[in-house]
Amino acid sequence: ILYTIGWLVTLPSYLLKQKRRGGFGTGLMERFGLYRVSYNREPKGVLYVHAVSVGEVVIALKFLRAWLWERGGSAVLATSTATGHATAMNAQVPGVRVIYSPFDLLGLPGRCFDRFEPEAIVLVEAELWPNFARAAKVRGIPMAMINARMSARSESRYRAFKWLSKYYFSFLDTMGV
């Protein structure tokens, strides 16, 4: 609850900062779980890959090319930054729908998951968003974290809030470093 309140309090300043940086383009609505493409035209039963910025997107694209070549199907690649989104769009990987990640506010990740009905979620980062993770768990969507690295600074934070870290990491089904 405190996390969500914090999100709501900081959201206006975040939106203002993004506007100064060039805005969201068409991505702002996607951050609220609203999409231009008709629901019936969206891929279902996808592999949902969450990559925040350019570095994670590059790794995600390599992962997705290998995954889709081996297994087929389709995927959703969700990014959080305009540069990460542009990198993913420019790659034009067949079978991959690129979206902006929903804000981690109650209801928004779930709305996104209900739209794409992911069979699994792969996080390409060492960050776990609480409402996102909870929405996946409630829907029974397995979640994995790949490319997980932890700096000394992050480690000290996780240790300081060990009880909270244990809770958040309990949402993961597997982790790859």
Language-model regions: role of each:
Residues 1-8:
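N-terminal, charge-rich interaction modules
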Residues 11-177:
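Active-site and donor-binding regions of nucleotide-sugar-utilizing enzymes
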